[in-house]
């Protein structure tokens, strides 16, 4: 998927678009690795149905062994998902430190949520080919209800909108208005659903990289597995020369042609992925109303739409989170004076 996924491939082929064949010799493609997830807790309540292993537990934590093997390659990464969301558990991202081994085992402890916990492991080899997943289910029922377990989930909102960039060439008209309208709608709509709503709102000069990262770290420290996290961003989004997707905070001075500066001041897809893994909230939604101003849009920028769409699709799939984006392939998000908003948020 990481190498060969092409957004909207069939309709683009039917429209007559020509694609350069990938520079891959099919004879060099290695077999997919295998992976096995083993529950190391009490197994007296084990149920097996259609090869799916289901365990019952009164402990709030589950100890797991994950073993990955590759017959003709090495293991480069092991991923663990809990109820569909990528997690880190007790290891450092489950990345294999010794990339030369054909077999690797990771042991980690997972914090369970009350009820059903579907735990899925996936291994990747050096060519980034994924294994067939290994899945177990742990049904957690606490032996005794604690008072703090009776508190409902919290909604964590991080909302960013940038109209006035440090570089005036990139000024937008309605990003801040869009962000404000979204904040108001979410606060009003969440009152009957969540026990608490925690909101961080960053606009214009407040929306530099340092402040956005600090706000993400705050959510990482406070969000619980039963909570929900929503990240909303209205501003510029670009693909670098190295084909990496970046959000563009207030203090980015150049969108194209300086990847080092973009990496220093921008927020990359890789950084978003790391925060998503480390934030414990299992329900996560990322909304990107990211566009390019007329001053920034040129033939190079327009041609990167497909690469941006691919980057977002890979990010959503790898993290197990949900993403809504304003622009599709070779499009840019529109702003309308008669609406007073960008079309996507409106």
Give the location of each predicted region:
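Short, compositionally biased P/S/T/A/G/V-rich stretches that sit at domain boundaries
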Residues: 4-56, 143-145
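Active-site-proximal C-terminal subdomain of hydrolase catalytic domains
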Residues: 161, 203, 281-346
């Amino acid at each position: 998927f990481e190498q060969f996924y092409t957004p909207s491939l069939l309709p683009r082929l039917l429209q007559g678009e020509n694609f350069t064949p990938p520079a891959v010799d099919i004879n060099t493609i290695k077999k997919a690795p295998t992976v096995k997830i083993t529950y190391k807790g009490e197994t007296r309540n084990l149920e097996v149905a259609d090869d799916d292993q289901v365990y019952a537990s009164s402990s709030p934590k589950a100890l797991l062994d994950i073993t990955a093997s590759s017959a003709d390659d090495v293991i480069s990464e092991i991923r663990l998902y809990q109820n569909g969301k990528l997690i880190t558990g007790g290891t450092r991202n489950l990345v294999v430190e010794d990339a030369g081994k054909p077999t690797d085992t990771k042991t980690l402890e997972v914090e369970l949520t009350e009820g059903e916990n579907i735990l899925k492991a996936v291994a990747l080899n050096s060519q980034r080919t994924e294994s067939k997943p290994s899945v177990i289910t742990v049904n957690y029922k606490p032996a005794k209800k604690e008072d703090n377990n009776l508190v409902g989930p919290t909604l964590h909102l991080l909302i960013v909108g940038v109209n006035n960039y440090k570089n005036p060439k990139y000024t937008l008209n309605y990003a801040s208005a869009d962000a404000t309208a979204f904040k108001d709608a979410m606060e009003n709509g969440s009152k009957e659903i969540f026990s608490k709503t925690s909101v961080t709102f960053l606009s214009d000069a407040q929306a530099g990289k340092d402040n956005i990262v600090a706000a993400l770290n705050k959510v990482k420290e406070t969000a619980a597995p039963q909570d929900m996290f929503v990240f909303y961003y209205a501003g510029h989004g670009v693909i670098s020369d190295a084909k990496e997707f970046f959000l563009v905070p207030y203090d980015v001075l150049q969108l194209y042609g300086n990847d080092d500066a973009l990496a220093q001041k921008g927020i990359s897809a890789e950084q978003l992925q790391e925060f998503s893994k480390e934030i414990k909230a299992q329900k996560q939604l990322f909304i990107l109303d990211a566009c390019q101003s007329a001053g920034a849009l040129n033939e190079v920028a327009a041609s990167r739409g497909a690469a941006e769409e691919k980057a977002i699709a890979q990010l959503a799939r790898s993290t197990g989170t949900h993403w809504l984006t304003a622009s599709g392939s070779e499009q840019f998000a529109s702003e309308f004076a008669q609406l007073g908003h960008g079309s996507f948020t409106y």
